[in-house]
Design a protein with these regions (language model features):
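A charged helix-plus-loop insertion that forms the helical arch/lid used to bind
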Residues: 115-134
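Active-site histidine-anchored catalytic micro-motif
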Residues: 35-94, 109, 135-252
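Conformational coupling and interaction surfaces
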Residues: 35-38, 52-65, 230-370
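Bacterial N-terminal signal peptides
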Residues: 15-26
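Glycine-rich beta-alpha junction loops
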Residues: 102-106, 187, 210-213, 254-261, ...
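N-terminal secretory signal peptides that target proteins for export/translocation
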Residues: 1-10
Length: 370
């Protein structure tokens, strides 16, 4: 725990908030709260020179990003932190703090994953644990290595403290107003829940990219790489903690995020307006599903959702064949051992999503901002 943001300080926030609520309750007339902006903290495993997933957030004037928190997932923490810091420099949005979080999952590890593969099945995408390559794109045994980036290293530094502490601080400063948006493994969110039991209930809602169900057949008939619940199985214990916490609302963006893939045609639309951001996005984007972009777009504009179902959801944490697999139940058959009802997005307005994504990617980058 950093000296600047200790657990004792977190407790003082909680106590101060309690006293304030008591004073307001004692008064005969309370002032009406001012309308809140769409306040969001975005937690992700930012990896690569283009962080196009943040564009629906920083390109939408109705959204106020309180901060970006970083977690190991697709890459290691330090490399991911450098990637998002550099992209924010390109976008001239270094006013938004970036806070480092968990370097490792709560329980899972590379060794455990290799052992699981030896007993059950090969995992195509292992994120930070992918086999090492000649260019250090992946370096599974060196979590502190930051390979050279094609867009150069960042000059800015991450904010002090840890992601979990920052998450807790912000929901106490803005109770019931902050959307916790997660598109990577859920380690940071789980740590915040364990540090402060009031954290989840003080947030406005949780939206997360994950909760892919019925992926087994999709791995046979489609892509074994795309039909995977990486964010869940990378840290199943964290996912279990998060999905059993008392959120006001939980939204899962799972299989629907496979529906839209980055194409040259989309790149051409984005490139029609030349800015440092659009040039970076078009140059480094790959032909992959827009998993995180769809998730952030839904957080910025919930009306993009055209279909959803509700079900109870949790994650298998037994270290067997189904370790890290998401399960859903109707109310009648759910075990009711703490799992929560989740809004599972099943359809979005794809045309409007793409139109808004192009618009957000082309946001005017201020020339006079450092």
């Amino acid at each position: 725990v950093s000296p600047s943001l200790s657990y004792a300080r977190i407790r003082r926030w909680i106590c101060a908030a309690t006293v304030t609520i008591g004073i307001l309750a004692a008064g005969t007339v309370a002032a009406a709260p001012a309308p809140a902006s769409n306040l969001i903290i975005y937690d992700n495993d930012f990896f690569g020179p283009e962080s196009a997933d943040i564009l629906p957030l920083i390109g939408d004037p109705s959204v106020k990003v309180l901060g970006f928190t970083v977690v190991t997932g697709d890459g290691w923490l330090d490399e991911e932190t450098a990637d998002i810091l550099r992209f924010l420099e390109i976008a001239k949005r270094t006013d938004i703090p970036v806070v480092k979080g968990a370097l490792f999952p709560l329980v899972n590890s590379e060794a455990r994953t290799r052992a699981w593969e030896g007993m059950y099945a090969k995992i195509v995408w292992k994120g930070a644990w992918n086999a090492a390559g000649p260019d250090n794109t992946f370096h599974p045994t060196d979590p502190y290595l930051i390979p050279p980036s094609p867009v150069g290293p960042p000059k800015t530094k991450p904010a002090p403290g840890t992601a979990a502490e920052f998450l807790i601080e912000q929901v106490h400063l803005h109770p019931h107003q902050v959307t916790i948006l997660a598109a990577g493994p859920l380690t940071n969110i789980a740590l915040a829940i364990r540090l402060d039991p009031a954290f989840a209930s003080l947030a406005k809602q949780l939206i997360f990219m994950g909760g892919f169900v019925d992926t087994n057949l999709q791995q046979v008939t489609g892509s074994a790489n795309f039909a995977t619940d990486f964010n869940i199985w990378f840290d199943p214990e964290a996912a279990d903690i998060v999905l059993t916490a008392p959120w006001a609302k939980i939204t899962s963006v799972g299989g629907v995020s496979n529906a839209v893939v980055y194409t040259p045609e989309l790149g051409a639309r984005i490139a029609a307006k030349a800015t440092p951001v659009t040039q970076t996005v078009v140059k480094y984007s790959q032909a992959l599903p827009l998993w995180d972009q769809i998730t952030t777009a839904i957080a910025a504009d919930p009306s993009l959702v055209t279909g959803e179902i509700q079900a109870y959801m949790d994650v298998d944490t037994d270290h067997g064949m189904y370790y890290g697999v998401t399960h859903v139940w109707p109310d009648a058959t759910a075990p009711h051992l703490g799992e929560r009802k989740v809004h599972i997005v099943t359809a979005i307005d794809t045309k409007r999503f793409l139109d808004e994504f192009v618009r957000d990617a082309q946001f005017p980058v201020p020339a006079d901002r450092p």
